[in-house]
Amino acid sequence: TVNTFADGRKFISGNRCDKPVTGKSEDNSLNLYAYKQQLLAGYKPVPGKRGSIGIPLCLNMYELLPFWHAFWTKLGFAVHTSPVSSRGLYLAGQATIPSDTACFPAKLSHGHIKALTQMHLDAIFYPCLTYNIDEGLGDNHYNCPVVAYYPEVLAGNCPELEGQKFIYDYVGIHRPKDFVHKM
């Protein structure tokens, strides 16, 4: 709400937006989200001699795509990703969502898995990750329980995964020595 006084002064209440007072327009040239989507869209499959791996662009896999794409590509696999999230992708996987209480990003992952199964890949990779990479910015680096273990939910509720190699092992990327032995 902008309150204008008799002497011309303006006072804004209810939020911190000073646009009506300063007359400055919003600067959209530094849209971090658009920049990030552009970067992630640049990760294309490189022909791999060892087969093809699918990575769903959902939950923590969205954030970790640069790492996993480089990892599997260096090992000789062609890495394919599911399409960008959309209403259509959500609707495609909606029938396999076991609970309305899951967050919307988790519900979207069902559509991502369905899209990957339709690509006829050698395997789909979506590991359970209790911890994320420790960036040293907080007290801990736990993943949300839904994010950490949702691959288990997908494995048990997506019938299209039957007959599809689905790698959803528990992996610890937070401890490099253990990671090397696990992978």
Language-model features, listed with the residues they occupy:
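An N-terminal assembly and electron-transfer interface module characteristic of large anaerobic redox
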Residues: 1-183
